[in-house]
Swiss-Prot record:
<dbReference type="InterPro" id="IPR045174">
    <property type="entry name" value="Dof"/>
</dbReference>
<keyword id="KW-0862">Zinc</keyword>
<keyword id="KW-0863">Zinc-finger</keyword>
<feature type="compositionally biased region" description="Basic and acidic residues">
    <location>
        <begin position="104"/>
        <end position="121"/>
    </location>
</feature>
<keyword id="KW-0805">Transcription regulation</keyword>
<feature type="binding site">
    <location>
        <position position="60"/>
    </location>
    <ligand>
        <name>Zn(2+)</name>
    </ligand>
</feature>
<dbReference type="GO" id="GO:0008270">
    <property type="term" value="F:zinc ion binding"/>
</dbReference>
<feature type="compositionally biased region" description="Low complexity">
    <location>
        <begin position="88"/>
        <end position="99"/>
    </location>
</feature>
<dbReference type="GO" id="GO:0003700">
    <property type="term" value="F:DNA-binding transcription factor activity"/>
</dbReference>
<dbReference type="GO" id="GO:0006355">
    <property type="term" value="P:regulation of DNA-templated transcription"/>
</dbReference>
<keyword id="KW-0539">Nucleus</keyword>
<feature type="zinc finger region" description="Dof-type">
    <location>
        <begin position="33"/>
        <end position="87"/>
    </location>
</feature>
<keyword id="KW-0238">DNA-binding</keyword>
<dbReference type="Pfam" id="PF02701">
    <property type="entry name" value="Zn_ribbon_Dof"/>
</dbReference>
<dbReference type="GO" id="GO:0000976">
    <property type="term" value="F:transcription cis-regulatory region binding"/>
</dbReference>
<feature type="binding site">
    <location>
        <position position="35"/>
    </location>
    <ligand>
        <name>Zn(2+)</name>
    </ligand>
</feature>
<keyword id="KW-0479">Metal-binding</keyword>
Amino acid sequence: MQDLTSAAAYYHQSMMMTTAKQNQPELPEQEQLKCPRCDSPNTKFCYYNNYNLSQPRHFCKNCRRYWTKGGALRNIPVGGGTRKSNKRSGSSPSSNLKNQTVAEKPDHHGSGSEEKEERVSGQEMNPTRMLYGLPVGDPNGASFSSLLASNMQMGGLVYESGSRWLPGMDLGLGSVRRSDDTWTDLAMNRMEKN
């Protein structure tokens, strides 16, 4: 009986080895090819391009460039050509949108004095500022510190210290009370009486 189990184990092990050998693709032995650019024999095989056996990729250690056997030679600079952005001293069009624009226009009262109109682009229609009742288009840019200085009174909403509602978590209309007994329908941006 013991001979039968050992024979079965041997048969199973030999079948597993045969199956493992069949699953591994036999890769051809890679020879040292000459570089098509500089004809240097100092090359090495890297990998198969996209795991395709018909497109082996090679690297020339002399000119430090890659090529695919049978592929077109591309004029790629040494080092692969980087896409790093250069540090530019000039301003780009996108940075001009972030800067303040100042337009001078004459006074209509005829006094000859000129006033400057300042506006910060991107702040005119800020939905977060509208949601919390902060001034929209404020050139001074009311900040979070100015909100704290106002004792958390956001556009007439008063934060109750006993509730667990925090600004920014949700609307929390059950734990927020208006000082003048009206509430704001934020979706329609209109005032209604209770």
